[in-house]
From Swiss-Prot:
The modification Phosphothreonine is found at T250, T253. Component of the 26S proteasome, a multiprotein complex involved in the ATP-dependent degradation of ubiquitinated proteins. This complex plays a key role in the maintenance of protein homeostasis by removing misfolded or damaged proteins, which could impair cellular functions, and by removing proteins whose functions are no longer required. Therefore, the proteasome participates in numerous cellular processes, including cell cycle progression, apoptosis, or DNA damage repair. This is 26S proteasome non-ATPase regulatory subunit 4. The gene is Psmd4. The modification Phosphoserine is found at S256, S360. Residues 197-262 are annotated as: Interaction with UBQLN1. It comes from Mus musculus (Mouse). It comes from the Eukaryota.
């Protein structure tokens, strides 16, 4: 594992307010710096990282330290202001690296450039030659203003590397949703000593390498399991509640249906008398009952009647039904029919009472017909 001290230079100019990187260039840069700091410290526990701003006075926010929490807390206090002074910032970072505690540490500067570099190319090349002599590697993340800066920064990095050198890198990132994702797959994190650290967050469960931080990975796994159990419990409760509501509504519906059915049965029972047991009646009683039903105008049919006969009755001529009804209301006609029926005694008390009622009904109907004709 490579022992290395790294100074991270962040761009905090007014250009960092732009939103071509979500949500802004400044916040996208913060996420990328977070990844860089963790990558360097995890690659070797003895590695140190420092933080410096490039705008205005090039302020050193933190000196070299293995404490990434301290670095990130300072990083989130950075606010956009002024313009960057690239060459000055690189010189200050180089000076900070000279004061590193581990003299056997290699020196590296990682610079984020998200605004136009106003230094001319000649000054950049001169600075690169000096850094190469001091064996300082520089990685540059060029984003936001790549059209303006790419040519200058390419000359700077090529001078650092020389003909055969590969220690310094220039990564140009076009506008997009994530600066950090582009940085993860870049040679800056996957280069010398950083092969393990070039893995993206999607390559590990919960974005954490279990071998690097087993306690954090375990805590995240337990937290996710608890969250899954809570969601399943909430889903079961919701299903039980909906089932309970459906269970309450269903008996209510059945009760209302039963009540409606009982009401209909009661109406049928009180609206007309039930059918008598014809098998227990004598022939005279059956004839008397038939005549009584005819007088009341109630149609009577047995449940065992043939369907074809009933359909024929439904489709019969209305005029014919009216004639049959008039004939059945004629007492003399009925008397003659009863006398000709075998086994029927016309002098039976039940038959005579029905015939008397029929005669009186016919008399009333005749009077009513006369009154209606007189009114006309």
């Amino acid at each position: 594992m490579v022992l290395e001290s790294t100074m991270v230079c962040v761009d905090n100019s007014e250009y960092m307010r732009n939103g071509d990187f979500l949500p802004t260039r400044l916040q996208a840069q913060q996420d990328a710096v977070n990844i860089v700091c963790h990558s360097k410290t995890r690659s070797n526990p003895e590695n140190n990282v420092g933080l410096i701003t490039l705008a205005n006075d090039c302020e050193v926010l933190t000196t070299l330290t293995p404490d990434t929490g301290r670095i990130l807390s300072k990083l989130h206090t950075v606010q956009p202001k002024g313009k960057i002074t690239f060459c000055t910032g690189i010189r200050v970072a180089h000076l900070a690296l000279k004061h590193r505690q581990g003299k056997n540490h290699k020196m590296r500067i990682i610079a984020f450039v998200g605004s136009p570099v106003e230094d001319n190319e000649k000054d950049l090349v001169k600075l690169a030659k000096r850094l190469k002599k001091e064996k300082v590697n520089v990685d540059i993340i060029n984003f936001g203003e790549e059209e303006v800066n790419t040519e200058k920064l390419t000359a700077f990095v090529n001078t650092l590397n020389g003909k055969d050198g590969t220690g310094s890198h220039l990564v140009t990132v076009p506008p997009g949703p994530s600066l950090a994702d582009a940085l993860i797959s870049s040679p800056i994190l996957a280069g010398e000593g950083g092969a393990m650290l070039g893995l993206g967050a999607s390559d590990f469960e919960f974005g954490v390498d279990p071998s690097a931080d087993p306690e954090l990975a375990l805590a995240l796994r337990v937290s996710m399991e608890e969250q899954r159990q809570r969601q399943e419990e909430e889903a079961r409760r919701a299903a039980a509640a909906s089932a309970a509501e459906a269970g309450i509504a269903t008996p209510g519906t059945e009760d209302s249906d039963d009540a409606l059915l009982k009401m209909t049965i009661n109406q049928q029972e009180f609206g007309r008398p039930g059918l008598p047991d014809l098998s227990s009646m004598t022939e005279e009683e059956q004839i008397a009952y038939a005549m009584q039903m005819s007088l009341q105008g109630t149609e009577f049919s047995q449940e065992s009647a043939d369907m074809d006969a009933s359909s024929a009755m439904d489709t019969s001529d209305p005029v014919k039904e009216e004639d049959d009804y008039d004939v059945m209301q004629d007492p003399e006609f009925l008397q003659s029919v009863l006398e000709n029926l075998p086994g029927v005694d016309p002098n039976n008390a039940a038959i005579r009472s029905v015939m008397g009622a029929l005669a009186s009904q016919a008399t009333k109907d005749g009077k009513n017909d006369k009154k209606e004709e007189e009114k006309k």
